[in-house]
Amino acid sequence: MNKALFLCLVVLCAAVVFAAEDLQKAKHAPFKRAAPCFCSGKPGRGDLWILRGTCPGGYGYTSNCYKWPNICCYPH
């Protein structure tokens, strides 16, 4: 009985540790996987997305220019 209780306690502690670790990861925003780029006629710096036909959603991009085969996306 003591071994079974100890095993349950170990499993419970491990579950708490892994759950807390996942919550820590969820707090951080995902990194953009883009390089800096510039388009002629547009002020500021854009994000160069390699081998994409369109700008990805969820980053607030409002304009873009093509640098074949890549795309340079501009926020706001």
Curated annotation (Swiss-Prot):
Expression tissues: Highly expressed in the ectodermal tissue from the distal and proximal tentacles, body wall, and oral disk.
One function term, GO molecular function aspect: potassium channel regulator activity
Any one of the GO CC terms: nematocyst
Keyword line: Cleavage on pair of basic residues, Disulfide bond, Hypotensive agent, Ion channel impairing toxin, Nematocyst, Neurotoxin, Potassium channel impairing toxin, Secreted, Signal, Toxin, Voltage-gated potassium channel impairing toxin
Disulfide bonds: 37-72, 39-65, 55-73
Membrane-spanning intervals of the chain: none
Subcellular location: Secreted; Nematocyst
Signal peptide: 1-19
Protein origin, superkingdom: Eukaryota
Propeptide stretches in the record: 20-31
Classification via InterPro entries: BDS_K_chnl_tox, Myo_ane_neurotoxin_sf
Chief location: secreted
The keyword GTP-binding is annotated on this UniProt entry: no
Biological process terms in GO annotation: regulation of blood pressure
Anything else known: Is the most represented component of the BDS family in A.viridis. This protein sequence is identical to BDS-1 from A.sulcata (AC P11494).
Family of the protein in this entry: Belongs to the sea anemone type 3 (BDS) potassium channel toxin family.
Protein's job: Acts as a gating modifier on both Kv and Nav ion channels, and also acts on blood pressure. Voltage-dependently inhibits voltage-gated potassium channels Kv3 (Kv3.1/KCNC1, Kv3.2/KCNC2 and Kv3.4/KCNC4) and slows inactivation of the voltage-gated sodium channel Nav1.7/SCN9A. Inhibits all Kv3.1, Kv3.2 and Kv3.4 by about 50% when tested at a voltage of +40 mV (45%, 48% and 56%, respectively). May act by binding residues in voltage-sensing domains S3b and S4 of Kv3.
Protein name as catalogued: Kappa-actitoxin-Avd4a
